[in-house]
């Protein structure tokens, strides 16, 4: 059986370790006395069809079901990852619990985009990875490695209703990139990560400005990077960023 959370994310079910159960094959049944070989074959075919029908009904009733495609004014919304310049991070996972209560695991991760300055934040960001087949976010779980410290952090961020309202509200705007009017949506959630476990979250759109959702304090992941799977080893820090930290240190308190 697949749990409701796994049903919301077929990729998670694929991580299960499926194995065939070995069994002893029984000997073929003897043909009853007085019954022709053709009668036996016909009877066995009917029995096989009945078994297949039962198996099909069982699979339909108990197998994983894909959630319906959410009704949004766009094909997908986006998650962007950001960090201050030289404050290198590695995102282990971004998980989403959408407003339907369906969980989607590892929808994003890896490297982040870096702002133009080390201290303070930029105005949000643009771009990101499309989050397909997922409804508007109710919660976002983030776990990452702050490589300049180094330290592993995790946080569960509650997304307020006003953010979801903004994400589906159309707005006419002159897009500065194309210099023409268009109807745009705030379909991007940007996650900014800084040393000390600081997280800033914005909502915005490609042709619209970004609005801050909030500033949050993450907690240290007690098991370390990769929840202990790497035995305390972090992703290596880029030499350029290491040289900057060695010379200037980490400007805690500026984010």
Show where each model-derived region lies.
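Bacterial N-terminal signal peptides that target proteins for export
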Residues: 37-48
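Short, surface-exposed binding/anchoring microloops in extracellular/periplasmic proteins
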Residues: 68-96
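Short, low-complexity, Pro/Ser/Thr/Gly-rich segments in the mature regions of secreted, periplasmic
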Residues: 238-255
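Bacterial signal peptide processing site
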Residues: 61-63
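Tryptophan-paired
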Residues: 97-148
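Compositionally biased low-complexity segments at domain edges in trafficked proteins
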Residues: 167-236
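C-terminal motif of bacterial Sec signal peptides marking the signal peptidase cleavage site
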Residues: 56-59
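Edge beta-strands of extracellular beta-sandwich domains
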Residues: 152-157
């Amino acid at each position: 059986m697949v749990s409701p959370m796994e049903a919301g994310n077929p990729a998670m079910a694929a991580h299960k370790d499926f194995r065939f159960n070995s069994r002893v094959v029984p000997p073929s049944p003897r043909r009853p006395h007085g019954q022709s070989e053709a009668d036996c074959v016909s009877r066995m075919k009917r029995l096989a069809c009945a078994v297949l029908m039962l198996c099909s009904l069982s699979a339909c009733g108990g197998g994983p079901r894909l959630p319906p495609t959410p009704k949004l004014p766009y094909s997908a919304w986006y998650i962007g990852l950001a960090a201050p310049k030289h404050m290198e991070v590695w995102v282990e996972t971004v998980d989403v619990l959408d407003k339907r209560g369906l969980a989607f695991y590892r929808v994003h991760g890896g490297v982040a985009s870096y702002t133009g300055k080390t201290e303070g934040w930029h105005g949000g960001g643009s771009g990101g990875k499309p989050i397909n087949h997922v409804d508007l976010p109710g919660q976002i779980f983030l776990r990452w490695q702050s490589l300049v410290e180094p330290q592993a952090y995790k946080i569960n961020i509650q997304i307020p209703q006003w953010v979801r309202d903004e994400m589906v509200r159309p707005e006419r705007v002159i897009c500065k990139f194309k210099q023409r009017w268009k109807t745009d949506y705030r379909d991007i959630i940007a996650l900014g990560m800084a040393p000390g476990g600081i997280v800033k979250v914005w909502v915005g759109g490609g042709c619209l400005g970004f609005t801050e959702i909030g500033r949050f304090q993450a907690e240290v992941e007690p098991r370390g990077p990769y929840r202990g799977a790497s035995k305390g080893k972090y992703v290596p820090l880029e030499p350029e960023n290491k040289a900057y930290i060695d010379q200037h240190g980490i400007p805690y308190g500026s984010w």
